[in-house]
Amino acid sequence: MKLGVATICPHIFHEGQWWSYEPYVLEMNVWQELFEELVIVAPHDQGPPPESWVPYRDSSSITVVPFRRDRGRGLLQEPASFGEIPRMLYAVTKAALTADAFHVRAPGNIALVASLLVPLFQKRLVAKFAGQWIGAPGEARTVRWQRAILKSRWWRGPVTVYGDWPNQPPHIVPFFTSVLDNHQMARAQAAAANRNAAGWADRNLRLLYVGRLSASKNVAVVLEALAQLKPAVTIELDIVGDGPERAALERFVNEQDLRRQVRFHGNVAFDRVLEFYEQADALTLVSASEGWGKAITEAMAFGLVCIGSNLGVIPWLLGEGRGLVVPPNDATALASALREIAGSPIEHFQTGQRAAAWSQRFSLEGLGNALRELLGKHWRMPELNPHSDKAK
C-alpha cells in the first residue's frame, strides 16, 4: 500500500539516501513500517545535510515530489509566495493520484493546499496537527484556516492532535508522538533510576534547554530568570539548538556576566542530546506556543524536573506532580520556580521520578501500535503491517 505525505520538512538526497530533520524522520520510519511506499511532497534542498539530520531507514521505498528548492532549511525557510501555489497544486495532485492513502502533516502552507485538494482524490485520509490545537495568540491566519478545514466535514479522515479538548468532532483524536525507541526508553529509565535522591544538594542545579533558538521559544526569558537569581542562586544552563536568536542571546549572556553559567552547544546529533538529558537535573521550555512539547516528554523519561508553559497540552503533561508550569513570558515566575527546585532537591527528585514512570508509555513502538489501531478503525481495514504479507 502506498502512502502520500505532505510536509513542510525539507529533504536532501545525499549518498544514495533521503535525509531530513531527525525527529521527523524517526517518526516517519514508523509510518514506513505500515506502508510499502511513501510518496512525499516536500521542499527539496541541496548540499550535504546538517548534523541534526538523519537518513530514512529505507530510502528505496521513498519518492520525493518537490514543490520548491533552495529556500532555506526547516523553520528557517522563506515563506511561500503566491507564485509557488501552482507548483504546490501540481505536486500534491501528482502524489494523491499515485497513492492509496494520504497523510497531511499540518500546520504548513503545503498542508493547507493538501487539506483542500486531497479529499477530491482520496477516501483514505489522515492528518496530524503538530501545533497547539486550541490556538495561540498571534498565530497566522493560514494556521487557523487549516484547523478549520481539518475540523470540518470536508476532511473525511482522523486528525491526530495533542491533548483531549472538549466540544471536538469525533474525527479529532487525542494522540501523542515520540522519537524514543524501546532501547532509548530503557536507557532513559536506567538514567532516571540511577539519579541520586539528594540530587543537587551539594552543587549547582544543572538546567537544560533543547530546541530552536527563536523568539517564540522564549529562551531570553530563561536567561533573564537566571540573571534575576544572581548572586543568591547559581544555576548552570546548557542550551542545545540553534536559530536566529542565538547572537542576541549570546550578547545578553555577556552583558549579564552569565558566561560561567551558560553554555551554547548548537545543533547536535540526537544521541548527544540523550547524553545531555542524562547529565542534567532539570529542563525548561516556556514557549509562547507549543504542540506536544517533545523535549519535555523526552526529559521526563530521563527523570528530569521539567518547567513548561501554562498553555496548550503542557499543563496536562506536567500535571499531578510531574512538573511545574509558569506563564510563558514571566521571567520572575520562572525564577521563582527555579529557586524552588534548586532549594528542594529531595522533593523534586520525586517529581522527576513520577515524570519518568508516567512517560514510559510514549515510545516509537507504542506510536506504531497506536497508528495501526487508529487507521484500522477509521479506514475499516485489517491491521496495517506491510512486513507480514504486505498491506493490501
Q: Over which residues does each language-model region extend?
A:
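A short, well-ordered alpha-helix in the C-terminal region of glycosyltransferases
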Residues: 258-261, 340, 347-361, 373
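Short alpha-helical segment that forms part of, or immediately flanks, the ligand-binding pocket
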Residues: 274, 293, 297-301, 315-316
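Conserved acidic donor-binding segment of nucleotide-sugar-dependent glycosyltransferases
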Residues: 320, 324-331, 340-345
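Short alpha-helical donor nucleotide-sugar binding micro-motif in glycosyltransferases
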Residues: 96, 267-268, 275-280, 371
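Aromatic "clamp/platform" in nucleotide-sugar-dependent glycosyltransferases that forms part
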Residues: 288
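Short hydrophobic beta-strand element within catalytic cores of glycosyltransferases
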Residues: 305-308
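A conserved mid-protein helix/loop that constitutes part of the nucleotide-sugar donor-binding site
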Residues: 205, 209-228, 244-250, 332
